[in-house]
Amino acid sequence: MKKTLHRILYRTLPLEGYLRAVSRLFFLWQRLGLGRRAPETEYVYHLPQLVRAGDTCIDIGANLGYYARTISRLAGPAGRVYAVEPVAPIRKVLSRNLRRCGNTEILPFALGAAAGPVRMGNDSARENGYFGTGRNFVNEGGGRSDVEFTAEMRRGSELFARLPRLDFIKCDIEGYEAVVMEEMRPLLERFRPTALVETG
């Protein structure tokens, strides 16, 4: 049912309209508690056990704000949330979805082991019949992708070097998690944050 709805929306709406509709559906799904047992959304419901008021948090692969919005609410006005999202069309809708989250800053970068321009791809439309917003990947091999984006890559260890504290990291970046977490090792060792990392 959900995949069919995604396909219909993707085929009938322009990309931004599709992204806005998908995010609205997710937030409705979340408010109604319907995603508690769905593998792709269940972890957002565990955030109250992981994030506290006043925490400094980083959401790497912020996508449309599914986690960042909840993290922002939990961290509260004394907290700080950095939402990292490199893909411009997704980031535009993310900005709209986080407009009431005054403690959140959106960073327009991909994180990795180097700094500079990077090609990103997304092949989900060919595979699923719709654009999967969480299926963007760094295209290191240089092959053609169905949808391609250019982004700016930064080292997380440099981007966040001046943070006075770091309490929580969520990292979901389509197989690039190990690269980013290894590159950010100095920050992880310094602050020992709680980490929610996709692994497979």
Language-model segment annotations:
Residues 1-200:
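Phosphate/nucleotide-binding beta-alpha loop and adjacent structural elements of enzyme active sites
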